[in-house]
């Protein structure tokens, strides 16, 4: 399964991702309150007020880690956790921590998260093509040419191996022929020497 198809299978889980992102922002806000030593906060659709030794009110809060939590998101998520609508919500730090813990537990046991786990398992089990998708025509032609070249090279190497070596000519047969040639008859030679002249 290629990367684009894997990404496409995640589209069914966008609502889960948005819920996780919203909850993450509220968790970050709670951590920032603890870091600052704030005792409580007051949230409306347009403002976040942190109440502590140094109270502050702003349309958004930027944590020491650079995370930004806007009032509209925090107000909406906190309203969902509280379970009722109100112009503003006031919670202390302990109550906010309890609300966040309950939200995390509900998310872990949700059908949406189980469905996401099934999708991950299906993606992991899908075969992958390390070479990537084949380009029509071009890749096929290149592969055919490469196979033909490899075949020709193998044929040439096999022919070179099977061709019998040409025997070297040796001087030995000449010597044999010289030794085997008829020699003058020694007796005839001696007879000629003993024949009296006329």
UniProtKB/Swiss-Prot annotation:
Signal peptide (UniProt feature, chain positions): none
Residue ranges, annotated region (Disordered): 124-198
Disulfide bridge positions per record: none
Free-text disruption phenotype from the record: Cells lacking this gene show a normal growth rate, do not exhibit a decrease in the efficiency of natural transformation, and is as resistant to ionizing radiation as wild-type. However, deletion of the ddrC gene decreases the ionizing radiation resistance of the recA mutant strain, and appears to increase that of the pprA mutant strain. Moreover, cells lacking both ddrC and ddrD exhibit a slight (two-fold) increase in sensitivity to ionizing radiation, but this phenotype is apparent only at the highest applied doses.
Keyword Nucleotide-binding set for record: no
GO biological process, one term: cellular response to desiccation
The UniProt record lists the keyword DNA damage: yes
Start-end of Basic and acidic residues biased regions: 136-180
Physiological role: Appears to contribute to D.radiodurans capacity to survive exposure to ionizing radiation. May play a role in DNA repair and genome reconstitution.
Name of protein: DNA damage response protein D
Organism: Deinococcus radiodurans (strain ATCC 13939 / DSM 20539 / JCM 16871 / CCUG 27074 / LMG 4051 / NBRC 15346 / NCIMB 9279 / VKM B-1422 / R1)
Gene: ddrD
């Amino acid at each position: 399964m290629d990367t684009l198809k894997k990404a496409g299978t995640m589209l069914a889980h966008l609502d889960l991702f948005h819920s996780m992102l919203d909850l993450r922002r509220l968790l970050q806000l709670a951590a920032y309150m603890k870091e600052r030593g704030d005792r409580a906060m007051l949230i409306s659709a347009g403002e976040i007020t942190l109440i502590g030794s140094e109270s502050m009110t702003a349309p958004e809060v930027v944590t020491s880690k650079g995370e930004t939590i806007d009032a509209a998101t925090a107000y909406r998520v906190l309203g969902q956790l509280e379970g009722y609508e109100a112009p503003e919500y006031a919670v202390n730090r302990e109550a906010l921590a309890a609300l966040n813990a309950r939200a995390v537990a509900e998310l872990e046991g949700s059908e949406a998260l189980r469905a996401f786990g099934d999708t991950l398992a299906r993606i992991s089990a899908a075969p992958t093509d390390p070479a990537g998708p084949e380009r029509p025509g071009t890749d096929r032609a290149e592969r055919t040419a490469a196979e033909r070249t490899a075949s020709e090279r193998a044929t040439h190497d096999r022919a070179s191996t099977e061709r019998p070596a040409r025997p070297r000519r040796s001087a030995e047969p000449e010597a044999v022929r010289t030794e085997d040639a008829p020699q003058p008859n020694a007796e005839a030679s001696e007879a000629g020497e003993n024949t009296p002249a006329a």
